[in-house]
Amino acid sequence: MAQRIFTLILLLCSTSVFAGLFDAPGRSQFVPADQAFAFDFQQNQHDLNLTWQIKDGYYLYRKQIRITPEHAKIADVQLPQGVWHEDEFYGKSEIYRDRLTLPVTINQASAGATLTVTYQGCADAGFCYPPETKTVPLSEVVANNAAPQPVSVPQQEQPTAQLPFSALWALLIGIGIAFTPCVLPMYPLISGIVLGGKQRLSTARALLLTFIYVQGMALTYTALGLVVAAAGLQFQAALQHPYVLIGLAIVFTLLAMSMFGLFTLQLPSSLQTRLTLMSNRQQGGSPGGVFVMGAIAGLICSPCTTAPLSAILLYIAQSGNMWLGGGTLYLYALGMGLPLMLITVFGNRLLPKSGPWMEQVKTAFGFVILALPVFLLERVIGDVWGLRLWSALGVAFFGWAFITSLQAKRGWMRIVQIILLAAALVSVRPLQDWAFGATHTAQTQTHLNFTQIKTVDELNQALVEAKGKPVMLDLYADWCVACKEFEKYTFSDPQVQKALADTVLLQANVTANDAQDVALLKHLNVLGLPTILFFDGQGQEHPQARVTGFMDAETFSAHLRDRQP
């Protein structure tokens, strides 16, 4: 008897273990939205807390959270900063992971008042949910003058910079600016002023005074960075608008042109004169006077420093990150100050000889600044044209560097010239493809010929009109990143297109998420996107063939072969 019971238990365990072998290959491994983003709320008079418990491997979009009161008045809702998430099609977006708590202050609520909360999220594995809407019933709240102020929102992890350069680049840029013709010749004079004309100071004392001077200059730049970053944080949404991005790109281009010598960009001479007089009144050789001199020097922008400084300030405004803003400008000032400290301690013998090379350094920084408008315009014009702009910039830079290097007389420069010429030839490739139609030829194969449907009735009618042919239904939305990946990487593959040659292709665009879209998704029992359904010649779906989440071309082709009879 015991042996029979043991055998039965073993059989049951074996059944459960091997059951997974027979799971449908298209079966969704994703949980419903209510499990991925468990929503809850709690009200205590004027204070309402909205909470989301976010499942591991999932995230909510910050910009997709909307709160609308009905028969109630609430204070401005302050969404906490999230962490940056990047994808190929939407760039960088702020998201929330793990848990989100959102305090809402209710100033007044009538009986029966509600709060409509809309949010949307995705899974890391490439699966996005339609926007979810929850209705929060509110307890009656009487308005009074003592209503609490909006609750400060706990900050999540500060987002990192969303621009192409790290703050450490500012240190290198500062060092490079020190070798431009407007700055390098001034260092011996500045060194003498800082030391107060005293040539007998000890090395430690001279280094200390110079360090204090650099810190004064860094203080000014850091303050500028903090102010600009704070302003950028307030207008960060506006700074992402295409018109604003185009305007900033034009400004960056003008700044680069000033580095090329087309015009001079600096503070008005009257203001520069006043600042110089204020600096001259300070006593050199004393820590306090030297610090003030450095702080004032940070405001006196020469023609060589104005454009890079302006570019860095606009870069910081785009990031909206105060830590990044202050730190970037501090490192920039420190980079400019390092050569001054070395000259003060070791003397002018460390200075390289002046010459045309300093103008070339200035021109090189013009190309560095030109990289920023290309980065900004790439968000507006897309990847293809962005690649062409990067190509044009690369050809211009390496071509200029190659022509400049021809003036060199040293033998080893021949190797550098070969490298620069090769880099220019590599950079020009995207422009060649564009000019000779290679890109156009590739793009002619990128799209399947889908028939669009909107409602359940249209789907049923399309299944009838298929006349015995198999049908594939692709559920698509603009907010679904993986749907765009399917279009670009999977549906464009020749093997996939060949496998679908005898299949009727339907597509439902549910971007609007309106009543018809919701009804269609509910009818098909779809949790989120991307989801691809397959129907036989009789109009019956094959649930085991359903695809949820992204598949590359090879995997999807194998899936298509497996579903064939």
UniProtKB/Swiss-Prot annotation:
Pfam families: DsbD_N, DsbD_TM, Thioredoxin_2. It is found in: Cell inner membrane. One of its GO terms (biological process) is cell redox homeostasis. Changing residue 304 to A: Loss of activity. Residues 434-565 form the Thioredoxin domain. InterPro entries: Cyt_c_assmbl_TM_dom, DsbD_gamma, DsbDN, DsbDN_sf, Thiol_diS_interchange_DbsD, Thioredoxin-like_fold, Thioredoxin-like_sf, Thioredoxin_CS. Changing residue 122 to A: Loss of activity. Residues 1-19 form the signal peptide. Its EC number is 1.8.1.8. It catalyses: [protein]-dithiol + NAD(+) = [protein]-disulfide + NADH + H(+); [protein]-dithiol + NADP(+) = [protein]-disulfide + NADPH + H(+). Disulfide bonds join 122-128, 182-304, 480-483. It is a multi-pass membrane protein. GO terms for cellular component: plasma membrane. Its main location: membrane. Residues 184-207, 264-295, 344-356, 405-417 are cytoplasmic. Keywords: Cell inner membrane, Cell membrane, Cytochrome c-type biogenesis, Disulfide bond, Electron transport, Membrane, NAD, Oxidoreductase, Redox-active center, Signal, Transmembrane, Transmembrane helix, Transport. The chain crosses the membrane at residues 163-183, 208-228, 243-263, 296-316, 323-343, 357-377, 384-404, 418-438. Residues 20-162, 229-242, 317-322, 378-383, 439-565 are periplasmic. One of its GO terms (molecular function) is protein-disulfide reductase activity. The consequences of replacement of the cysteines with alanines were found to depend on the conditions tested and on the reporter system used for the analysis, and then differ depending on the references. Belongs to the thioredoxin family. DsbD subfamily. HAMAP family: DbsD. PANTHER family: THIOL:DISULFIDE INTERCHANGE PROTEIN DSBD (PTHR32234:SF0). Required to facilitate the formation of correct disulfide bonds in some periplasmic proteins and for the assembly of the periplasmic c-type cytochromes. Acts by transferring electrons from cytoplasmic thioredoxin to the periplasm, thereby maintaining the active site of DsbC, DsbE and DsbG in a reduced state. This transfer involves a cascade of disulfide bond formation and reduction steps. This is Thiol:disulfide interchange protein DsbD. It comes from Escherichia coli (strain K12). The gene is dsbD.
